[in-house]
Each structure stands twice: as structure tokens, then as C-alpha cells.
């Protein structure tokens, strides 16, 4: 899990979702997991 100021999709499987006002990137590749904060 990476915490970043700006999150973006890294590959085609990445999805940006909003969970309890926190933006997240979920992906099949665990390395691509991100959270904005």
C-alpha cells in the first residue's frame, strides 16, 4: 500500500474507488495498491 498525494491508475486492471471519503486504487497486482492521504 502506497500513500500518495495524487493517485493514478498504473495498469488497465487498476480501479479508483472512494471508500469513506478516502480515494483508493485496487488492483490484481498487490504492488499497485494506493491510498490518497
From Swiss-Prot:
Transmembrane feature ranges: none
HAMAP family reported in the protein's UniProt record: Ribosomal_bL36
The protein's name in its UniProt record: Large ribosomal subunit protein bL36
GO MF term set: structural constituent of ribosome
Keywords: Ribonucleoprotein, Ribosomal protein
Disulfide bond sites: none
Cellular component annotations (GO), alphabetically ordered: cytoplasm; ribonucleoprotein complex; ribosome
Superkingdom: Bacteria
Family: Belongs to the bacterial ribosomal protein bL36 family.
GO terms classed as biological process: translation
Amino acid at each position: 500500500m502506497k500513500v500518495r498525494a495524487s493517485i493514478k491508475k498504473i495498469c488497465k486492471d487498476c480501479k479508483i474507488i472512494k471508500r469513506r471519503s478516502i480515494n483508493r486504487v485496487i488492483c490484481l497486482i498487490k504492488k499497485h495498491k494506493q491510498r490518497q492521504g
